[in-house]
Amino acid sequence: MASDLESSLTSIDWLPQLTLRATIEKLGSASQAGPPGSSRKCSPGSPTDPNATLSKDEAAVHQDGKPRYSYATLITYAINSSPAKKMTLSEIYRWICDNFPYYKNAGIGWKNSIRHNLSLNKCFRKVPRPRDDPGKGSYWTIDTCPDISRKRRHPPDDDLSQDSPEQEASKSPRGGVAGSGEASLPPEGNPQMSLQSPTSIASYSQGTGSVDGGAVAAGASGRESAEGPPPLYNTNHDFKFSYSEINFQDLSWSFRNLYKSMLEKSSSSSQHGFSSLLGDIPPSNNYYMYQQQQPPPPQQQQQQQQPPQPPPQQSQPQQQQAPAQGPSAVGGAPPLHTPSTDGCTPPGGKQAGAEGYGPPPVMAMHPPPLQHGGYHPHQHHPHSHPAQQPPPPQPQAQGQAPINNTGFAFPSDWCSNIDSLKESFKMVNRLNWSSIEQSQFSELMESLRQAEQKNWTLDQHHIANLCDSLNHFLTQTGHVPPQGGTHRPPAPARIADSCALTSGKQESAMSQVNSYGHPQAPHLYPGPSPMYPIPTQDSAGYNRPAHHMVPRPSVPPPGANEEIPDDFDWDLIT
C-alpha cells in the first residue's frame, strides 16, 4: 500500500496529457457520452431534473405550509405541466398559487424572486410570442442545452467559473482565431507559423520593399481555401517529446531535461521560419559609413566609384548632409550650425550629389581634426559672395596618352565638392605609383611630400598648388574628363576659399556668429590649415580673378559688437 502511494505521488503520467488537443478531445467525448446538460455546472437553485413534474401526492402534502422547493424548481414544475412546455409569467404565477395556497397571501416578494430566476437562471429561456398568437407577454421555456456564452443583463453567479475549460473551449472556435492573422497557428508541415498570414506579410513589405504583399496575400488566400482552415493546435512532430526521455530516478532532472528539449525545439523551429523569409532580403547600402576599406581590384573600382542613382527627391538632402556629416563623423565634434549648400553648390555639384557621390571612407594617413585645435567648419554668409561657375579643368597634354583607360570617375567640378576632393585623395592613394612615370607630376609629388612632412598643415598657396597638381594628375590618368581650353599653370598664392581651412584662433576670428545666427564677414589670415578642405560659399572655383577674391563686407546687424571677445589660448590644446 505504501509503495502504491509513493508511486502515485511521484508519477508524472499526467504530464504528456496536458495539451490543448487532449483537453478538447476530453470535452468532446464527455459531451457526447453524457446526457444533455450533464457536462455543464448548474447554477445554484437549478432543478436537478429539467423534465420533473409535480405529482398530486406531493401537492397535497404542501397544501397547508410553505413548500420546501426552490423557486427554480417551482418554475420547472409549472412549465412542465403545460402541454406546449412553455408559459407566460402570469400563467406561472397562477399555477403556483393554485397548487401552493401559501403564496396567495405571502405578498409580492416571491413574484420578484420568480422574475429574477427566469432572467438570471440559464435553465430558462425566453421565447417570443408568435404573431398569430394573440395575447400579452412572451413565453418562458426550459433550455435543455443552455448557451453558456449567451449574454445576460447581469453577470453570472460566482460559482460558475469564468475560466473553466468549458468556456475556454466555447470561446475558441475558428471564427475568433481566424480574425487575427498573427494569432493563427500554422497547418502541419509549415514551419513558418504566422509569417504566412497576408496581414503580416503586407505590413512587412511596407518596411523592406522586398516582398510583394498583393501576390503573397492572393497566394495565402488560395492556399487557405484549398487546404481548409488551420487547426487550433500545432501538429508538428518536433514539439512532441518521447516518454522514454524522462528519467524517473531524479524527478527534478527530468523536468529540466523536458524544459530544455522543448526550448531547443521551439527555438530551432522559429529560427528556421524566420531565416527562410529573411534570407532573400538584400543588405541595405549605406553610402555614409566612414570605415577603412581595402583597395578593390581594378575591375570593381569603377563600379564602386559609381553607385546606383538614388531617386531625384533624395538628391538634395544627401547633398545637404554630406558637408555636415564629413567633419563631424571624423572628429566627433559637430559644427555649430549646419551649412546649407543650396546657395553655394554649382549645378555640377548638385549633379554630382544626385549621381550618388557621398562621403568616401576617410584616409588612414589623415590625423584626427581635433589635434589641430577645436575648430568647427563654418560657411560664409549666403550674400557675401555670388556663386560662379567653376573654371574648366586642365586638358590633357598633347602627345601624352592617358595612363588609365578606365571611364571618368569624377565630374569636371571635382574640386568644388568636398566629397569629390576626398575621393580624389583616396584614389591617388590607391594608385600603383611604381607603374606611373612620376617625372610628369613633379609638382604633385612635391606637394604631397610637403603635406606629409608638415602633417598636412599647409599654407594656402600650397593647398592651391596641390589642387592644381591633383587636377592635372587626374586629367592625365583619365579620372577627370578633359575639356577644351589651354593648360593653365599652377596659380601663385591665393585665398583658397574652396579648399583652405583655418584652425585655432583663426577659426574663432573667421567664423564668429552674431546674435541673429548669421556668420559675420570673415577676416582672412594667412597661416597653416588643417588636413581636409571645407565647402564654403566660393567652393565653385578657386582659380577666379583677383577682384573676386576680396569678400564684400556684410552689414553687421544690431548687437553684433556686444559679443564677448574670444581670449582663450587655443594653442594650449595642441
UniProtKB/Swiss-Prot annotation:
Acidic residues: compositionally biased ranges: 563-574
Modified residues (Phosphoserine): S3, S46, S161, S164, S172
GO term, biological process aspect, one: positive regulation of DNA-templated transcription
Keyword Acetylation applies: yes
Disulfide bonds: none
Compositionally skewed regions (Low complexity) per UniProt: 28-39, 207-223, 267-276, 315-335
Location in or out of the cell: Nucleus
DNA-binding region: 66-143
Example of a GO cellular component annotation carried by this entry: chromatin
Compositional bias segments (type: Pro residues): 358-370
Signal peptide feature range: none
SUPFAM superfamilies tied to this protein: Winged helix' DNA-binding domain (SSF46785)
Residues carrying N-acetylalanine: A2
Tissue expression from the record: Widely expressed.
Biased composition (Basic residues): 375-384
Residue segments, region Disordered: 26-61, 125-233, 267-408, 537-574
Gene Ontology molecular function terms on file: DNA-binding transcription activator activity, RNA polymerase II-specific; DNA-binding transcription factor activity, RNA polymerase II-specific; identical protein binding; RNA polymerase II cis-regulatory region sequence-specific DNA binding; sequence-specific DNA binding; sequence-specific double-stranded DNA binding
Bias (Polar residues): 45-54, 191-206
Protein name listed in UniProt: Forkhead box protein J2
Lineage: Eukaryota, Metazoa, Chordata, Craniata, Vertebrata
